[in-house]
Curated annotation (Swiss-Prot):
Localization: Secreted
Protein name (record): Bacteriocin licheniocin 50.2
Biological role: Bacteriocin active against species of Gram-positive bacterial genera Bacillus, Enterococcus, Lactobacillus, Lactococcus, Micrococcus, Staphylococcus and Streptococcus. Active against L.monocytogenes (MIC=0.53 mg/ml). Has no activity against various Gram-negative species. Has no activity against strains of fungi C.albicans and A.brasiliensis.
pH dependence of activity: Stable from pH 2 to 12.
Keywords: Antibiotic, Antimicrobial, Bacteriocin, Secreted
GO cellular component terms attached to this protein's record: extracellular region
GO biological process: defense response to bacterium; killing of cells of another organism
Temperature dependence: Thermostable. Retains 100% activity after incubaction at 100 degrees Celsius for 30 minutes. Retains 70% activity after incubation at 121 degrees Celsius at high pressure for 30 minutes.
Extra remark: Antibacterial activity is lost upon treatment with pronase E and partially with trypsin but not when treated with lysozyme or proteinase K.
Amino acid sequence: WEEYNIIXQLGNKGQ
């Protein structure tokens, strides 16, 4: 899903 993709990217930036 596109939404899930964004969440994943945000999580990566958080780390």
